[in-house]
Amino acid sequence: MENNSRTMPHIRRTTHIMKFAHRNSFDFHFFNAR
């Protein structure tokens, strides 16, 4: 886990945003895309 943070420090931020956006963004995009 520590190695991942050093290799990809932006992944930690992306994961947090993806989890948060996954609920709103993904749901909205999926509904609109359909």
Curated annotation (Swiss-Prot):
L-ornithine binds at R13. Keywords: Leader peptide, RNA-binding, rRNA-binding, Transcription, Transcription regulation, Translation regulation. It comes from the Bacteria. Residues 1-13 are annotated as: Sensor domain. Induction: Induced by ornithine; putrescine does not trigger ribosome stalling and so appears to repress expression. Part of the speFL-speF-potE operon. A motif (Ornithine recognition loop) lies at residues 10-16. GO terms for molecular function: rRNA binding. Changing F31A: Loss of ornithine-dependent translation arrest in vitro. Residues 14-34 are annotated as: Effector domain. GO terms for biological process: regulation of translational elongation; transcriptional attenuation by ribosome. Changing F26A: Loss of ornithine-dependent translation arrest in vitro. Binds ornithine in stalled 70S ribosomes, blocking the upper two-thirds of the exit tunnel. Contacts 23S rRNA and ribosomal proteins L4 and L22. Changing the amino acid sequence by 2 frameshifts with minimal nucleotide changes indicates the peptide sequence, but not mRNA structure is important. An N-terminal sensor domain binds ornithine already present in the ribosomal exit tunnel; upon ornithine binding the downstream effector domain compacts in the exit tunnel, causing a shift of 23S rRNA U2585 which blocks the action of peptide chain release factor 1 (prfA), causing ribosome stalling. A small protein (arrest peptide) encoded upstream of inducible ornithine carboxylase gene (speF) that controls expression of downstream genes (speF and patE) by nascent chain-translational arrest and transcriptional attenuation. In the presence of ornithine a toeprint due to ribosomal arrest can be seen on the speFL transcript. Only L-ornithine (not other tested amino acids) has this effect. It is thought that in the presence of ornithine, ribosomal stalling on speFL prevents binding of Rho transcription termination factor to a downstream rut site allowing transcription of the operon. Belongs to the speF operon leader peptide family. This is Leader peptide SpeFL.
